[in-house]
Amino acid sequence: MTTINPMNFRRREILAGAGVLALSAVTLPPRAAGASTLQDRRPPKADRRFTSKAVEAEIARVKAKIRDPELGWLFENCYPNTLDTTVKMGEVDGKPDAFVITGDINALWLRDSSAQLQTYVHLTPQDTDLRRLFCGLIQRQARCILIDPYANAYMEDPNARSSLPAISDKTQMKPGVAERKWEIDSLCYTMRLAHSYWTATKDKTPFDALWAKGAALAVATLREQQRKDGPGPYQFQRVDKSPTETLMFGGFGAPTRKVGLIHSGFRPSDDACLYPFLIPSNLFAVSALRMLAQVHNEARGDAAAAQDCAALAAEVETALRAYGQMDDGQGGKVWAFEVDGYGNAIFMDDANVPSLSGLPLLGAADRRDPLWQRTAALAWSQRNPYFFSGSAAQGIGGPHVGMDMIWPMSIITRALNSDDDATIRQCLTWLKGSHGGTGFMHESFHKDNPANYTRPWFSWANGLFGDLILDLERRKPHLLR
């Protein structure tokens, strides 16, 4: 039976008590007795939520190039996991609608749903059904933003009240909102998904007036959270023993000097920020706003909306250069993790992307940039309090599930950003050893014991692992052979 890390038990117990664990939503195969059996871990075909012929062909094509049976088995299990288990298709006003849950929590996160589909975007030109899924999610996300741009997670029914304990949070909980933790990256991920789909297909279908209204509100919200003219409308407090679940000073967060950076209440991990200027998310905002500007220009011919995006991106970029860096202790500069604009900063990294380590994955940094390289090297070291090294693996975790718990996402990120064959091989070895016999990636696992893991069903990590294998097939096929 899966061992639950004690520091994460409180969260999982609360979610289970609220009736939001959705493991019964699909038929999952029983846990593997061991990797040596390599039994198919996918749901039976009749129980799969969504099937794409292009994705199935991609699985067969790439798996045939993988010599290691266990690595091929993991790819075949993980890559289609989002489609197999998390998608619910429908229609709204005659247009496709897609509700995509995270896995074992029955709600749609803007960040997770975007990242979960991202791995399939290169196949959309080949598959009408897959394009319909992307259109459905892009439209669903626009409607979610119009319900409340400050929410991070949403209910399937826009009129339903949250089934999570978030319903008792001290904030403005609206119908349709599952949780209302303000995170910059939530809105940025929707911009990136729209751009990726447009770039791959040149299909204007999802980019209608509804989408444009949602996109405009997203940009306005990012600007509002620069807080130049006061604290803004967002407040959040939660009655919880963990300080990572709430914001200080009446729910507005720690004080800041208003310098043009965007405030974030919470990190991509859903943990509260110590200092409200979360640098990885501000860097992501710059790249995402420029992606959105391109969609406005090309898909809608809306030069004014594109200019609005570009202007905010330029302002935040200027502020990042002035306030987003710190000394590395060795005479150089690195990106800080969080700052307050007064000169105070913390250095750490969290496995959830956008992380400092994961910036190139989002187009928010260049892998060849010396500033980013110094930052990533420092994050993969003892300077980062959430870098863990054990007998099972090395990797980065975060406060969300506690000490000594490595997130496979951080190992995948390291491999995706590396050009060194030995580093990538080591990451693949760690990942193969992390699944605890299940054939899937997890939220986290103990640095000394992969059988001690959190979240048996976490589709974002599964999709990112699929991304890694596809990347290696294109970039370093000899490592798979």
Regions found by a protein language model. Give the residues of each.
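N-terminal secretory signal peptides
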Residues: 1-10, 20-25
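Signal peptide processing junction and immediate N-terminal pro/mature segment
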Residues: 29-35
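Low-complexity, Ser/Thr/Pro/Gly-enriched N-terminal "stalk/linker" regions
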Residues: 36-111, 136, 165
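Well-ordered alpha-helical scaffold segments within catalytic/enzyme domains
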Residues: 54-67, 115-128, 189-204, 283-301, ...
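Extended, well-ordered alpha-helical scaffold segments
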Residues: 74, 129-144, 203-223, 292-295, ...
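Aromatic-rich carbohydrate-recognition surfaces in CAZymes
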Residues: 106-134, 138-243, 459-473
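Extended ligand-binding clefts on enzyme/binding-domain cores
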Residues: 110, 146-157, 166, 219-286, ...
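C-terminal capping/lid segments that line or modulate ligand- or cofactor-binding pockets
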Residues: 169-175, 180-182, 346-366, 404-481
